[in-house]
Amino acid sequence: MRRPPTRSKSRCRLLVHGVVAALLLAACTSGPDRDRDEEAVPDDLSPAPAPGERWQPAPGGSWQWQLTGKLDTSVKAAVYDIDGFTTTKEQVAELKAAGRRTICYLSTGAWEDFRPDAGAFPPSMRGEGNGWEGERWLDIRRLAELEPLIAERFDMCRNKGFDAVEPDNMDAYRNKSGFPLTAGDQLNYNRLIVRLAHDRGLSVGLKNDLDQIPELVGDFDFAVNEQCAQYDECGRLTPFIAAGKAVFHVEYELPASRFCPASRELKLSSLEKKYDLGAWRKAC
């Protein structure tokens, strides 16, 4: 992922500590864009999977991505991508009762000191900071140690009733992680993430990592991308669309009018969002 100032983190720092949480909540009071959200929800849902099968999101459906502030369950979107730790089982059930699909957001490539399981990741596994306070890249070569830690997180997603997972920080090899990571290391780790999700009946999305799409499009069930329009990269996501797999896309610095025509042509599920990833959205 690109680093500030050219690009923000894959999500706004999840400021959920004490007073900061209250300030963030106040900052997110502007509701979602209602001009684009008056349509009925379930008509763009992918068909329900048969028992024992995973949900497969199809291209072009509507979605909402909210990681901060009080969860707004009234947004008229077919898919909700929300924080796996802070979202409750009851909130997931409410969304699913209303016909929505739910994606469990987690960081799988970086350590976060504010997560309840932070102490389970040994210090030697934590590398350089990834540009955000309290976060460090993980040594993704240590598959045997990481597997049970990530498996426990995915168990949490499954037990809360999520349909899918969005694993973040999936391109450590392209960053100054503090470890001599290779593209092969990243492929091995990303495929471990896929296996752990699929073993639990969860769909899984490839987050950014554009260079490895040709190798990974067959493994992942959908893609999540930030700012491909700003950096003229959206065409690189078309293998997912060609495979009948959704691409959930967000822009922060471009108005929707700048990227929506191309997004519709490419069948991307695109949003304009603010960097805090609160409830506000403008859908294409």
Each model region followed by its residue ranges:
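Compositionally biased, intrinsically disordered low-complexity segments enriched
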Residues: 5-8, 34-38
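Glycan-processing catalytic domains of CAZymes
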Residues: 18, 37-284
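N-terminal export and membrane-targeting signals
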Residues: 1-20
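Bacterial signal peptide processing site
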Residues: 29-32
